[in-house]
Amino acid sequence: MVEDTASVAALYRSYLTPLGIDINIVGTGRDAIESLNHRIPDLILLDLRLPDMTGMDVLHAVKKSHPDVPIIFMTAHGSIDTAVEAMRHGSQDFLIKPCEADRLRVTVNNAIRKATKLKNEADNPGNQNYQGFIGSSQTMQQVYRTIDSAASSKASIFITGESGTGKEVCAEAIHAASKRGDKPFIAINCAAIPKDLIESELFGHVKGAFTGAANDRQGAAELADGGTLFLDELCEMDLDLQTKLLRFIQTGTFQKVGSSKMKSVDVRFVCATNRDPWKEVQEGRFREDLYYRLYVIPLHLPPLRERGKDVIEIAYSLLGYMSHEEGKSFVRFAQDVIERFNSYEWPGNVRQLQNVLRNIVVLNNGKEITLDMLPPPLNQPVVRQSVAKFIEPDIMTVSDIMPLWMTEKMAIEQAIQACEGNIPRAAGYLDVSPSTIYRKLQAWNSKDEKQNV
């Protein structure tokens, strides 16, 4: 931490101590640069105003010698334009002083997590952020915590989420983090297998059990012995087979199709659906007793549109992988493409993002993804809707009228809150540039300070 005011440095140290972070505090830019000769930090918190040089000078020096070290600027209200400029030169983020404890912790935690992810990907090509996942949004942090807590248990996990959110990736993450990680992970898609074959796929069959059964065959249950059995799109399973599945879950035993012998296996059940499982129970399409057997630990995967900055993290990770695979040289997205990605709803979630990027990489060349390369519907003008929604009174009176700046302030503050503090994303929804929001925040903060004097 580069902060020349001792009391502020001590306060911020107390905020970050619960994270278990080792913090080295220096008071000048020269000391900060010199300290890099002895120890390279995971993150630098840098004040813009220092007694011997500017924060921008320190930024340039650090980026020249250690370009991979992430830097977060801390700035007073009057220095926001400088902070925005600093981000253009390599700063990862900036915080407005005075900074609240929660905001500081989240920003620092995210920056360290992202830096660790990038380092791991450089050391181990193809390695992802967390057990195959990419993303550090608060919604995904909750998913990671649930996986960490539940992985070691044998309790059944029921994953819900829209199509394309990564339910199988989640199931694989649970398996990899469990004590069964070195045992088989067997997935069966209940929606992709014909009704008359799914029992055989699940439990296996003996020779002659039905037309075409020329040999004995192991099913998914037997193949998963000792490991994890993942039942994807479980709510598509026929009710008759649900009865047999319930018995299998209760006893750990099953019969192959055409056999009278019982087989016993030890499997951990993970299942998933893109429907509401309880609604399926209420409408008679899913057995209630099976629901209670499997719905022990619910785990909901958020849609991509609710994951904030994860969209761009995922996009960059996929771009690097696909460019290498297709022999292309793409390395970045144009700013208007980033804004389009952030404002788009992504009804097909991560799977749609994968398809969009594959289309772009295969059909185009260059180093930068530009707006004209986007396929439909992303190449169409975006009709934006304000994230901030106001309830209009039926009849407005003079007393209901607010100053225009106050209405604007409410809209911006609500948009920032809805976007989890992501100002560039909020700006995209409001159809203004991020710098416009920063300037307005600066003006309102100055107004508040004058009123408090």
Swiss-Prot record:
Q: Where is the Sigma-54 factor interaction domain?
A: 133-362
Q: Which GO terms describe its molecular function?
A: ATP binding; ATP hydrolysis activity; sequence-specific DNA binding
This protein's UniProt keywords: ATP-binding, DNA-binding, Nucleotide-binding, Phosphoprotein, Repressor, Transcription, Transcription regulation, Two-component regulatory system
The listed outcome for residue 94 to W is: Almost no light produced
InterPro entries given for it?
AAA+_ATPase, CheY-like_superfamily, Homeodomain-like_sf, HTH_Fis, P-loop_NTPase, QS_regulatory_LuxO, Sig_transdc_resp-reg_receiver, Sigma_54_int
List of residues binding ATP:
161-168, 224-233
A single Pfam family it belongs to is HTH_8
Which intervals hold domain Response regulatory? 1-112
- GO BP annotation list: phosphorelay signal transduction system; positive regulation of DNA-templated transcription
**Residue list for modification 4-aspartylphosphate:** 47
- Classification via NCBIfam families: LuxO_transreg_Vib
Q: What does this gene product do?
A: Acts negatively to control the expression of luminescence. At low cell density, LuxO is phosphorylated, and together with sigma-54, causes repression of the luxCDABEGH operon. This repression could be indirect, LuxO could activate a negative regulator of luminescence. At high cell density, LuxO is dephosphorylated and inactive, therefore the luxCDABEGH operon is not repressed and light is emitted. LuxO and sigma-54 have also a role in activating the production of siderophore and in regulating the rugose colony morphology phenotype.
This one is known as Luminescence regulatory protein LuxO
- What organism does this protein naturally occur in? Vibrio campbellii (strain ATCC BAA-1116)
